Design a protein with these regions (language model features):
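Regular secondary-structure segments
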Residues: 17-25, 67, 71, 75, ...
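Amphipathic alpha-helical segments that line or abut small-molecule/effector binding pockets
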Residues: 80-98, 147, 151
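Cytosolic nucleotide-binding catalytic cores of signal-transduction proteins
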Residues: 2-3, 25-27, 136-137, 144, ...
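Short, hydrophobic secondary-structure boundary micro-motifs
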Residues: 32-33, 101-103, 112, 169
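C-terminal peripheral helix-coil segments that are non-catalytic and often amphipathic
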Residues: 159-184
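N-terminal intrinsically disordered/low-complexity leader segments
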Residues: 1-9
Length: 184
């Protein structure tokens, strides 16, 4: 997606993103075409390509926007409290419920995992590198611990989404915190 502060371009980008999501409610992502997105968004081909390179670029922009919400919540945490960490991810998923369900239905949840693998190491380096636990590990070990954590948490969240978020998040969170606190 082309980054811009131009209100007209931002409006077009938003219309394109909304059009893709509306179409995904009726059709599989893999079957959608840029032409259908153009028609649904009521914009010209030139406008689309001025803002995005492909439908995958549109999807990527939506995933990035959602993950930005998550990272902003993480950055607001004042300590390394697991409850608050889990609250942040559950809150973002709940507030974007229909988006995550569309991703799940279209086998695209892996896009979030890929984005987390980009965002979380940066946040770690900025805010958690002084944590006493991480000071005992090599840089390579830290990389693998972060990857392990992202994979574990994201698999839990993916399962929750695939089960239509029926299990109360408090139940999931309590089980995870109990497991993590006894596995030392």
């Amino acid at each position: 997606m082309t980054e811009t502060k131009n209100p007209s371009a931002i409006y077009s980008q938003t219309q394109i993103q909304k059009a893709l999501l509306r179409l995904m409610k009726k059709n599989r992502y893999e079957n959608l075409t840029v032409k259908e997105i153009l028609y649904e968004a009521k914009i010209a081909r030139k406008t689309f390509y001025r803002n995005f390179t492909s439908k995958a670029d549109v999807m990527d922009s939506l995933v990035k926007k959602t993950m930005t919400q998550y990272t902003q919540k993480l950055l607001q945490l004042e300590n390394e409290n697991l409850d608050l960490f889990f609250d942040a991810i559950f809150d973002v998923v709940k507030s974007n419920r229909s988006f995550f369900k569309l991703l799940s239905r279209n086998n695209l949840l892996h896009l979030v995992s890929e984005e987390l693998n980009t965002y979380i190491p940066v946040i770690h380096d900025m805010y958690f590198s002084d944590c006493s636990f991480f000071k005992t590990l090599s840089k390579q070990q830290i990389t693998f611990v972060i990857a392990f954590n992202i994979g574990a948490i994201w698999n839990v969240i993916s399962r929750w989404i695939q089960e239509d978020m029926k299990t109360p998040e408090e139940e999931i969170k309590t089980g995870l915190v109990k497991y993590l606190s006894t596995s030392n």
